[in-house]
Amino acid sequence: MTIIFQFALVALVLVSFVLVVGVPVAYATPQNWVESKKLLWLGSGVWIALVLLVGLLNFFVV
């Protein structure tokens, strides 16, 4: 269970880093806004799912 928690936590950190870099870039480039908007929604959904997963796994690991 601990290894799953660690993988989920690393995935959360990586997705967070990608969103911190990618969101301002997506807002600064208006050329492909339709495609960027879909990716932003997808990234946000993945981030929320990972936050919930890490919280749930933290309950079981600790």
From Swiss-Prot:
Report the InterPro entries cross-referenced here.
Answer: PSII_PsbZ, PSII_PsbZ_sf
Q: Which Gene3D superfamilies does the entry link to?
A: Photosystem II PsbZ, reaction centre
The record's keywords, sorted A to Z, are:
Membrane, Photosynthesis, Photosystem II, Reaction center, Thylakoid, Transmembrane, Transmembrane helix
Q: Name one Pfam family in it.
A: Ycf9
Q: Which residues cross the membrane?
A: 8-28, 41-61
Q: Which cellular compartments is it found in? A: Cellular thylakoid membrane
Q: What is its main location?
A: membrane
Q: Which GO terms describe its biological process?
A: photosynthesis; photosystem II stabilization
Output a single Gene Ontology CC term carried by this record.
photosystem II reaction center
Show the disulfide pairing. Answer: none
What's its membrane topology?
A: Multi-pass membrane protein
The protein's job, in short, is: May control the interaction of photosystem II (PSII) cores with the light-harvesting antenna, regulates electron flow through the 2 photosystem reaction centers. PSII is a light-driven water plastoquinone oxidoreductase, using light energy to abstract electrons from H(2)O, generating a proton gradient subsequently used for ATP formation.
Homology family: Belongs to the PsbZ family.
Q: Quaternary structure per UniProt?
A: PSII is composed of 1 copy each of membrane proteins PsbA, PsbB, PsbC, PsbD, PsbE, PsbF, PsbH, PsbI, PsbJ, PsbK, PsbL, PsbM, PsbT, PsbX, PsbY, PsbZ, Psb30/Ycf12, peripheral proteins PsbO, CyanoQ (PsbQ), PsbU, PsbV and a large number of cofactors. It forms dimeric complexes.
Q: State what protein this is by name.
A: Photosystem II reaction center protein Z
Species lineage, top-down? Bacteria, Bacillati, Cyanobacteriota, Cyanophyceae, Nostocales
Q: What gene is this protein a product of?
A: psbZ
